[in-house]
């Protein structure tokens, strides 16, 4: 990997984090997971008549082939979240490497702050599908704090990396009283001026425009302190989604191999002390 302005102290973690994202990207580009992008089904003459009647493949599936409807819906949602995550994170990390930290933090907003809530709903919220399908004004990324904390805590039951708790992820991403949380720093990156009491820009200032070398060092520090835990957390949730929702199509023997690979990647960034 070629480094530009990234300080030496962050390079091992940067490299490991980039590898975690590449491992997640295997769900998009790997031949073992092609089923996420290709679904085939034979249609009888009766099915074709029903499809003509409905005029839309989604309406047809929902009315006449409900099981296939939910399978295809899950594939579209998970694949979309995977692409968002990988594409935004790769660009964010590349911008960090080039010291374009305002762009780097702005790019964290959609995949980490917003899309995580949708992934949590898919995995944990029993009412998600009814709301998503039936309500025109439903926003799955809107979530009150109590519900968000509850769903994050529920992930502790399905993940293997127990030290990275749901409550810790909340502190890293969503805690408004934490100046270094992703939501606070991404807000500052997106908006020239922020006015909330916990994230106020202040007089004679614009967010990220008067950044000193000391400020830049602190921004890098926050970025690489939280990023490994967030990526491991996300990697495990994507594993739960793919290997939980598509058991009939995925090779389940790949699951432990992915966990082993994840552990090896992180060991390169945090080697055990002898």
Can you say where each PLM-predicted feature lies in the sequence?
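Short, charge-rich amphipathic segments
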Residues: 37-50, 81-86, 113, 159-163
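Short, well-ordered alpha-helical segments
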Residues: 81-85, 176-184
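A short glycine/small-residue-enriched secondary-structure motif
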Residues: 61-66, 83-90
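Short non-catalytic regulatory patches outside canonical folded cores
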Residues: 67-78, 90-177
